[in-house]
């Protein structure tokens, strides 16, 4: 089983642009169940059930998608929004570029970790560990540029990745680093 098969993607945040300008009041009427309260938040919030995602739509035409577990769900979500807006006679781009901003994933090293020893071994320039403030160790990986949160249970949360393969690279790197110093 490859490392990628043991990694669970929990959330993908992606952005796109659907137009130069959008009338959010008109969109609020077109998207049943949407939330638009401009005095509280400048964007419109719309939640989908399938795939289970949410989008934030802004007057500038920018759209953020969150909650997707895979890239297909991001694409499906944007396609659904485009389709619904076009049906409501709202002009939007047909095939906008989608940019992944962040992928959050979890991984289990299947071994309890001594975070104090790890903090000493991995070098203070890349590590933050203050157990009084937060129970996890923050490990900033330079290549790929991601942040790993390591917990005593052996669970690892990876954030900051833009592509799925970056998560796998980071997991392989941290495993090698910990094996090299005999901590797993």
From Swiss-Prot:
GO terms for biological process: DNA-templated transcription initiation. Disulfide bonds: none annotated. Keywords: DNA-binding, Repeat, Transcription, Transcription regulation. It comes from the Archaea. The keyword Flavoprotein does not apply. It holds the Pfam family TBP. One of its GO terms (molecular function) is DNA binding. Sequence repeats lie at residues 9-85, 100-178. General factor that plays a role in the activation of archaeal genes transcribed by RNA polymerase. Binds specifically to the TATA box promoter element which lies close to the position of transcription initiation. Belongs to the TBP family. NCBIfam families: PRK00394.1-2, PRK00394.2-2, PRK00394.2-3. PANTHER family: TATA-BOX BINDING PROTEIN. HAMAP family: TATA_bind_prot_arch. This is TATA-box-binding protein. The gene is tbp.
